[in-house]
């Protein structure tokens, strides 16, 4: 089963949810601040979805050179329209996070390459990390936060997840999408192996993979690495 791009009514539902719940991005923004994001930097957001993170980041760091990339034409269109509505000039590209095709101008140029809540959808996880490490400049950092497979949840974590799904006042479509996303998500060891494989091609000087919740009870995997200096 393929759950990669989010298209059609699911893309619209995702945008409705995301644009009404900016606080859900706070934890990720805090991680980016910890990773050293600063005004004037070049930042690439792989699997950017409908552009909520871009609106939040450019409000806080107005001179970021920020490029959002998504495999879904629908998401790219929604992100462009949303940015225009918000009076922002932002760049969104159609592209696959599993290949730098269409991002050649950014190879080795980004200070930070990020991805939020999407890498669990990739069919080729090592290729996703490979793209991140190729885009980032020597000494720059990558940060991915995505979902963990259900079998890696402990018992209380699983119960919290079920309660979260039931209680969340979402569109039914989003509830099913979330359940499927966790069902098809990689295991923690898959994340470790994928990052290690990518780091064989583009060496890293520092890396850390850890799991914690997002303050609303759902475990996510965090993957940070710094590309070795030239
Ligand atoms: C749950 S959304 C997250 C969007 C955004 N990062 C956020 O946090 O709001 C996952 C996004 O990943 C995109 N996606 C899935 N596979 C992709 C791939 N191989 N390359 C680029 N985007 C992809 C989907 O189209 C969707 O927009």
From Swiss-Prot:
Q: What InterPro entries does the annotation carry?
A: Methyltransf_25, SAM-dependent_MTases_sf
A single GO molecular function, which one?
Answer: methyltransferase activity
Q: Which UniProt keywords apply?
A: Antibiotic biosynthesis, Methyltransferase, S-adenosyl-L-methionine, Transferase
Q: Sorted alphabetically, which SUPFAM superfamilies does this protein's record hold?
A: S-adenosyl-L-methionine-dependent methyltransferases
The protein's superkingdom reads Bacteria
Key word Iron present: no
Gene Ontology BP annotations? antibiotic biosynthetic process; methylation
Q: What is its EC number?
A: 2.1.1.-
- PANTHER family registered for this protein in UniProt: TRANS-ACONITATE 2-METHYLTRANSFERASE, TRANS-ACONITATE 2-METHYLTRANSFERASE-RELATED
Question: What does it do?
Answer: Mediates C-methylation at the 8-position of the aminocoumarin moieties in coumermycin A1 in the biosynthetic pathway of coumermycin antibiotic. Active on both mono- and bis-amides for mono- and di-C-methylation adjacent to the phenolic hydroxyl before it is glycosylated by CouM.
* Entry protein name: C-methyltransferase CouO
Q: What is the lineage of its organism?
A: Bacteria, Bacillati, Actinomycetota, Actinomycetes, Kitasatosporales
